[in-house]
A protein has these predicted regions:
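Phosphate-moiety recognition in structured ligand-binding domains
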Residues: 1-110
């Protein structure tokens, strides 16, 4: 979380834009509706990763990880369908290392 907040403030300061870091799926309904239905003024980066541990949904053939990934994919698809500027990054393997690599690339770009 600290790395994402640092990255967020670096982008804010470099580009002089408002930034926010949110974690799903809890944000998907409330703030997600604003992003998908409000003015086309945002730029979005959706970061997903494999769960370190996954649990099966009782009585189903799929897991909670599959449900979470489906929610993220659906949210991204709606942003894309509405013409929002959005990038999805899926990190596999070591999450901390992947976030460090992503952070370094974004900082170099801004």
């Amino acid at each position: 979380i600290a790395l994402l907040q640092t990255l967020r403030t670096r982008i804010r300061d470099a580009k002089r834009v408002a930034t926010v870091a949110e974690f799903g799926p809890r944000f998907l309904h409330s703030t997600g509706q604003t992003y998908k239905g409000g003015p086309n003024s945002g730029v979005f980066t959706q970061i997903t990763s494999q769960d370190a541990a996954d649990l099966p949904v009782p009585g189903e053939k799929y897991s909670f990880g599959v449900v979470k990934a489906s929610q993220a994919r659906g949210d991204f698809d709606v942003l894309a369908e509405r013409g929002r500027r959005a990038l999805r990054v899926h990190i596999t393997g070591d999450l901390a290392a992947g976030l460090q690599t992503l952070s370094a690339a974004i900082i170099a770009a801004v």
